[in-house]
């Protein structure tokens, strides 16, 4: 079972920051970055599925050094390898372009059985990237997952979704698929000292936008 876990770097909410001169975003030069919270839940879910079904977890992120930082943290948590999409064109503002870049990277890596993302990012909060990613890949998708089980033989996933008003829904999707994971779906593990040391020896690939065909 091969699982991609998408991780977005966001400004640490405890960081003091200011608006840039053009008043379009914050000044990121001195900001501290961390993984978007929901993406940590997605990574934890990926690690649990790997532990149950064997296989590998591939962490992927777009951006500069801030992306490399969250990928190293993901490796320390337990991901098997990381793909850093590092290029000016691999840091677009639109979710559409982000989803396209992620899709091309997954294809370049030979595809996968499952892609997990957080339900939304802590900064923009649109919740659109995962759905767009599924569309680019031509795969089924399920959103706002709070529970997930896989059947490798039938290549299906049963997803428990949290709907508005506290309602729950169970759906079955055919693999490969993209699933977005809700806040609080599990308890993300802390990176151990052993995990931090092991992360330094794990494969860490750096690809440009041109290399993934963007």
Mark where each language-model region is.
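N-terminal glycine-rich FAD/FM-binding segment characteristic of electron-transfer flavoproteins
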Residues: 1-214
């Amino acid at each position: 079972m091969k699982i991609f876990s998408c991780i977005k770097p966001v400004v640490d909410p405890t960081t003091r920051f200011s608006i840039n001169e053009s008043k379009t975003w914050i000044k990121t030069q001195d900001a501290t970055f961390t993984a978007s919270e929901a993406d940590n839940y997605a990574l934890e879910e990926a690690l649990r599925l790997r532990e149950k079904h064997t296989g590998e977890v591939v962490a992927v992120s777009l951006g500069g050094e801030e992306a490399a930082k969250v990928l190293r943290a993901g490796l320390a948590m337990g991901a098997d390898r990381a793909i850093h999409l590092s290029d000016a064109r691999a840091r677009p503002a639109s979710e559409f372009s982000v989803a396209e870049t992620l899709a091309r990277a997954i294809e370049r890596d030979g595809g996968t059985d499952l892609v997990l993302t957080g339900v939304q990012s802590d900064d923009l909060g649109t919740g659109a990237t995962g759905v767009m990613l599924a569309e680019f890949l031509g795969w089924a998708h399920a959103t706002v997952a709070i529970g997930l089980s896989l059947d490798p033989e039938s290549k299906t996933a049963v997803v428990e979704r949290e709907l508005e008003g506290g309602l729950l829904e169970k759906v079955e999707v055919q693999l490969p698929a993209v699933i977005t994971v809700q806040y609080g779906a599990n308890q993300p593990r802390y990176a151990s000292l052993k995990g931090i040391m092991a992360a330094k020896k794990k494969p860490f690939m750096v690809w440009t936008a041109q290399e993934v065909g963007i």
